[in-house]
Amino acid sequence: MLGHRPSGHANVSGTVRRFAVVASGVTPTNRRLLEAARGLGVSASLVQPANAAAWLRPGDVALGRLDVLPSLDGVEPGLYALRRLERAGIRVLNGPAALLAAHDKLTTAVQLGLAGLPHPRTVHVAEGRRPHLALPVVVKPRFGSWGRDVVACRSRLGLSHCLRRFRSRAWFRRQGALVQELIPARGRDLRIIVAGGEVVGAVERVAAAGEWRTNVALGGRRRAVDPPLDARLLAVAAAHSIGADLAGVDLLPDGSGGFVVLEVNGAVDFTDEYSLGGVPVFQRAVEALLAGGYAQADEEEAQAAGAHPSWARA
């Protein structure tokens, strides 16, 4: 059954010299990824972006885990460090192009559209320009996370007030905002962890009472879930569309039994509760990452079973 495939990747300890998480901080997720690699017999360390080129050599594997910031200003040095690793012949997972696409929600929207994947209609709006989308809409920054400065607007007056308020924000003056079709709130969504082209973990997130956003930072709750096949295939396709090796894909139910991609998170944090089928999510993620490439095991198994996702038939 999809999601309950036993952990069965080939032994990676003989093919990977060292595994490095390239990041500025030891977050719980980064620490658990390193522990999982060591549990597989692989030498693993956290490496600061500025030190990565001096520390890593061909035969090593580097996983880019750059912080989510409200602009590109603090991200560019990390992207440059990952680019240097690529040029040195080091295998980089979540490389600079993928992380940039995930960090910038406008680029994410473009890539999802080019891949033909379901995503809320999205336009970019800058100061002095009025968006042309049917109401209701969501206004959000191009960069950032945790639901900050994300506002639902259900009237033209509300939208005007929101944009007027955002004009005082430095981020809006620099990069504008996104105005996005509001998918009717159903109080829940899915976050699916994709690693190396495989679904390795998932939770359902439930919004707090009176809140339409499901972010845990805003009081939302989450519980482990085995996502349906359509959701799995869509999550793998969404991660692949931006070239992400490790990503958290947020899916909203569309009210017709299917899903739409809301966001693809390249710096996703997750916990043990995401585990599927009794296999620890961090072990499964590292195995899939070090196995290499986009195995797309879920898609291959689905094709063998004759499954055709609804969004691929649209």
How would you name each of these model-derived features?
Residues 147, 265-278:
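Glycine-rich phosphate/pyrophosphate-binding beta-alpha loops
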Residues 152-242:
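Phosphate-binding site of ATP-dependent enzymes
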Residues 21-22, 195:
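Short hydrophobic segments within beta-strands
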Residues 2-4, 13-16, 97-178, 182, ...:
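Active-site nucleotide/adenylate-binding loops and adjacent lid/helix of ATP-dependent enzymes
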Residues 211-261, 282-302, 308-313:
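A long amphipathic alpha-helix within ATP-dependent nucleotide-binding catalytic cores
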Residues 137, 178, 200-201, 247, ...:
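Protein kinase-like catalytic core scaffold
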Residues 24-121:
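Conserved N-proximal alpha/beta basic substrate-recognition cap immediately N-terminal to
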Residues 67-69, 143-144, 267:
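Short glycine-rich anion-binding loops that position phosphate/pyrophosphate groups of nucleotides
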